[in-house]
Amino acid sequence: MSRSWIAALSAIFLFPLAAVAGDLQHDAAAVFQPIDSSLVASVVKNNDVTPAKVELGRKLFFEPRLSKSQLLSCATCHNLSTGGVDAGPTSVGHGWQKGPRRAPTVLNAVFNVAQFWDGRAADLKAQAKGPVQASVEMNNTPAAVEATLSSMPAYVAEFQKAFPSDATPVSFDNMAKAVEAFETTLITPNARFDLFLKGDATAINDVEKKGLRLFIDKGCAGCHGGVNLGGAAYFPFGVAQNPSELIRPFADKGRSAVTKSSADDFVFRAAPLRNVALRAPYFHTGQVWTLEEAVNLMAADQLNETLTPDETGAIVAFLGTLTGDQPRIEYPILPPRGKDTPHPQY
């Protein structure tokens, strides 16, 4: 991303999207897309999603023995009961270490252009490998994960079923593929906003419609559009003015750590806003605890806008329409330890 590109983007953000008089549903349909399960197949690459992989991935998602301490699982930081995130500003990992950023939601993550706030993982397979190996998170190694899973006959049988053509089905790569397969099922369709996009004008009320109109016309949809209302591209954080050090620490340069380009300093993947009402606290630092504060902060720092309390309330009301049907996942009974299963290390 060049500095000229950022400058051009910033200029766009400082002015609202053109307010088009007319039908709100028509205008919204030009910017947003309802969730449809048929979209999943078009975005998952190099991984055939089968029922056997999904079932194996469900177990692995809840499997604490993927971590060195055998205390932490994917579900520890991505709690499916609380919007696919945990409750703190940043997650607590191995040895009670605190992570540097807020855990992104796993719900609808399959629709994101890439994973993590800085987009360093191209897909959910790559993302699944990261926390397992991160010293501040699960602090494990691929070899140790393979040894652990291979030590439990029930897992060996499930890997063989999920990857029948592989000579060595129990592998770190296949662990990640199974987790990805499961996570493709973690979508939240049928939000009231989806019903509105599909033609039901009564699905959202007048205040929520006002919030939607403001969301479009003020420029919020410039970053938060598409099926996930975000997650599709990268944008500088602090266009009109720099957020406070608490919200945007100077030491965290965002995407430039991935691209190695200073042009990407403080550039982050736009947060997807589906189910956002369930996911406080907000931003990559997790330092904003209410949607009202988050909306006002983004209006000021990104769009150079000062919202009235009524405008803020209307936008927050609209954001509440983005909560969809939450996944109904049965908590799995995991395979018992084998005689050679490694012991936990704290």
Please describe what each predicted stretch is.
Residues 7-17:
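Bacterial N-terminal signal peptides
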Residues 2-5, 19-346:
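Periplasmic c-type cytochrome electron-transfer domains
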